[in-house]
């Protein structure tokens, strides 16, 4: 779907769906499917095992719920969620939210990001910070003494806010 508020859906095995207009949505429900939404405030969802979802517009959201799925959100204030077992979720936009499931990995390259902590999960925070010095912070569920579902906001590698579920 290429117009504003359009939607696209693929339900077969290895299908793909793409929505490029503002507020568009794309969904792929078959195993190994992919979904992409590139417009402002778009959403993409892949629910099959090893599926991938990507949202590139500002405020977009991407979700992959199958095992070993991946989700990516590259716009500011976007969110990425890969809740299946061993999934990966990546955000690059400032003030975004990232979440992965058990034994998964969540990654962000934004200076300020919120991680939704899950047991066994790892969060990798690559940030630039002041004076353009690139740094890396690796946080674990256990190491942060998090509660399942707790929203932990990092700014330049430091925890600045914690919100219990």
Identify the function of each model-found stretch.
Residues 1-164:
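Periodic small-residue-enriched repeat registers in elongated scaffold domains
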């Amino acid at each position: 779907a290429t117009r504003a508020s359009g939607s696209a859906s693929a339900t077969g095995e290895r299908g793909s769906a793409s929505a490029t207009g503002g507020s568009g949505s794309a969904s792929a429900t078959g195993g190994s499917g992919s979904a992409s939404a590139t417009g402002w405030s778009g959403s993409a969802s892949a629910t099959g095992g090893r599926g991938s979802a990507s949202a590139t517009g500002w405020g977009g959201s991407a979700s992959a719920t199958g095992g070993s799925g991946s989700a990516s959100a590259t716009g500011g204030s976007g969110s990425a969620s890969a809740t299946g077992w061993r999934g990966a979720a990546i955000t690059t936009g400032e003030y975004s939210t990232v979440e992965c499931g058990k034994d998964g990995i969540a990654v962000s390259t934004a200076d300020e990001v919120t991680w939704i902590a899950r047991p066994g999960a790892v969060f990798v925070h690559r940030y630039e910070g002041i004076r353009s010095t690139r740094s890396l912070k690796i946080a674990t569920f256990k190491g942060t003494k998090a509660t399942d579902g707790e929203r932990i906001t990092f700014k330049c590698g430091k925890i600045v806010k914690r919100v219990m579920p």
